[in-house]
Curated annotation (Swiss-Prot):
Consequence when changing V79G: In mutant M9 + W99A; induces ability to mediate plama membrane rupture
Entry keyword Transmembrane helix: yes
Feature: compositional bias, Polar residues: 12-21
GO terms (BP aspect): cell adhesion; nervous system development; neuron cell-cell adhesion; tissue regeneration
Induction of expression: By nerve injury; in Schwann cells.
Cytoplasmic topological domain residue ranges: 93-96
Principal place of residence: membrane
Protein name: Ninjurin-2
Entry similarity comment: Belongs to the ninjurin family.
Membrane topology, record value: Multi-pass membrane protein
Gene behind this protein: NINJ2
Binding site for cholesterol: Q103
Signal peptide stretch: none
Region spans: Disordered: 1-21
Length: 142
């Protein structure tokens, strides 16, 4: 026997909001907005890291490496943002543009991958001693 829950009426006139079909354009828009917020957060984080590294000055251990990696990450994020705007402006429903959209989407995905890898290295090179070990090292310098 099927329960009433399994027989959901997907007609647009249905009064139950749970039984309404999903508007895929609305879903994609909400997903894009959420991803954009994460992109902005990463951009702000990298800008703050760059500021901190520049304030420490060239005497810090990985100064040149961190400035280079953070700058490259920021540049890639700007390029990805421009690429995503171009992708959003092209109409997916036009068959002659679908191949180009697919290529642009692949390029954006590859650039995002490189950005993630670069940010892993930024985190690795930017790690500082914290907590117990940092307090012990400051009391007993080698």
């Amino acid at each position: 026997m099927e329960s009433a829950r399994e027989n959901i009426d997907l007609q647009p006139g249905s009064s139950d909001p749970r039984s309404q079909p999903i508007n895929l354009n609305h879903y994609a828009t909400k997903k894009s907005v959420a991803e954009s917020m994460l992109d902005v957060a990463l951009f702000m984080s990298n800008a703050m890291r760059l500021k901190a590294v520049l304030e420490q000055g060239p005497s810090s251990h990985y100064y040149t490496t961190l400035v280079t990696l953070i700058s490259l990450s920021l540049l890639l994020q700007v390029v990805i943002g421009v690429l995503l705007v171009v992708i959003a402006r092209l109409n997916l429903n036009e068959v002659e543009k679908q191949w180009r959209l697919n290529q642009l989407n692949n390029a954006a995905t590859i650039l995002v991958f490189f950005t993630v890898v670069i940010n892993v290295f930024i985190t690795a090179f930017g790690a500082h001693k914290t907590g117990f070990l940092a307090a012990r090292a400051s009391r007993n310098p080698l």
